[in-house]
Amino acid sequence: MTLVGILTAVAIGLVVGVIPGIFGVGGGFLLVPLLHVLAGVPIPIAVGCCSAQSLGTVTTGMLHRRAAGERSLRLAWLLFPGTLLGLELGIALLEWTKHSTALLTIAGRTLPLMETTQLVCYLAIMLVLAAVVGLEAIYNVDEHDAHRRGALDSVALPPRIALPELDGRSVSLPLVTLLGLFVGILNGGFGMGGALLQVPALVYLFGVSTHRAVAVTLASSFLTGVCSTASHAYRGNVDLPLVCWLLLGGTLGAQAGSLIAVRLSGRKLRRWFALVILASTGIILARLGHLMLGE
C-alpha cells in the first residue's frame, strides 16, 4: 500500500471506529461505502475487510461480557444455523457479482449492472436503518422490563423453545431461524453485522430485554464474524494490510467515540446517529450520480 492509501485507510477506520464508541453499534453500514467510494476498493474486497475488521471489535466485546459473567446465550446458538445459511447465500451472491460483467443502460448511459445494483441495495438498507432509528425514537423500550412481550409472541408456529433470555417464555424456532437468515445475508453480502436490525428485532418482535438483546447479538456476531472472515479469506476477499490499518484507525476512533458519548444525551445521540445515516446515504447517492453522469 502507498502512503496515501495507508493514511486513507487509517482515516476511514478512525471515522468508522467512532460509531461503536458513541452509539454502541458497528460501523459496517458506513465502512463498505467509504472504502468503495473514497478509497476505490472493490465492493467484494470492502465487504471481506469489513467482516475481518468487525471481528476484532466483537471479540473484545465478547471477552468483556464473559468477564462480566454473561452466560445465558442459548438464543445466539439458535440464531446461528439460520445466520450461517444466510451468510453463505450472501457471500455466494457477492461472488457472482464479482465475476459479472453485465452492463445496464439508463438514459443513454452504460453502467456496470452489479455495482449499480449493489449501491441501490445499500441505499435501501440505509432507508430501513433510518426507519429503525425513527421507531427507536418514538417507542422507548424500558430496559428493566424483563416481562415485555414481543409482537411475535402470539405466533404459535412450532416448534417453540423456552429460553432463559425470555425468562422461561417460549419462542418459535422457525421465526428465530428466519431472523438469523436475514442477518446472515446482510453480513455475507453487504458486510453489515446486523446489530442495527437484530437488536430492535429481538426487543420488539421477541420481547427480549435490551440488555440481553445486546448480549445475544454480540455473541451471534462473534460466531458469524469468525465464519464470515474465514469464508471471505478463502475466496480472496480479505486484504490483510488494509484490515490492519483499519483496525488501527478503528481503535483510536472507538476511544474518541467513548469520550464523546459521555457528553451527549440520548436524544442528541439519536440525532447524531441519524446524521451519520444521512451522510452514508449521501456518499452512496454521490457514487450513483457519478456513475450516471459518466466517469
Stretches found by the model and what they are:
Residues 27-41, 96, 105, 127, ...:
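Membrane-embedded alpha-helical segments in integral membrane proteins
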Residues 215-228:
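Hydrophobic alpha-helical transmembrane segments of multi-pass integral membrane proteins
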Residues 3-5, 42-56, 184-189, 218, ...:
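Structural signature of hydrophobic alpha-helical transmembrane segments
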Residues 47-48, 214-215, 274:
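Conserved glycine-rich helix-kink/hinge and helix-boundary motifs of the Major Facilitator Superfamily
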